[in-house]
């Protein structure tokens, strides 16, 4: 397995993977999301590749205060092999190198496998201390 930075020729494979992993949301065009990411900290957009196939992704961000991770997904046939752990670990290293003191992962509350993995990686469940609100500022064309 190789963890590397997203490349332009990964577009189709990544979007297909996101569809398989049920990571796409209504009103969010994944191509536009990727294009936006490529204009800001593209080196924090990582893919896991096995024998030339993209099997995992994580899209990180850092605003100078906190790090964040989105689009963490691993192809169903490749789960349980440590790929998500490796993606998170590589992102953490990149964020630490930038001086990032903390990272936030937002995981759907019904995703037991990812919650278990986060707990094993010593992430704390902080949902009782705050509520997450979001507001879509730009609605992409329906995907």
Curated annotation (Swiss-Prot):
It comes from Photorhabdus laumondii subsp. laumondii (strain DSM 15139 / CIP 105565 / TT01). It is an enzyme of class 2 (transferase). This is Acetyltransferase plu1384. Keywords: Acyltransferase, Transferase. It holds the Pfam family Acetyltransf_1. Residues 1-138 form the N-acetyltransferase domain. Belongs to the acetyltransferase family. YpeA subfamily. InterPro entries: Acetyltransferase_YpeA, Acyl_CoA_acyltransferase, GNAT_dom. PANTHER family: ABC SUPERFAMILY TRANSPORT PROTEIN (PTHR43072:SF51), N-ACETYLTRANSFERASE (PTHR43072). HAMAP family: Acetyltransf_YpeA (MF_01127). The keyword Transmembrane does not apply. SUPFAM superfamilies: Acyl-CoA N-acyltransferases (Nat). Its EC number is 2.3.1.-.
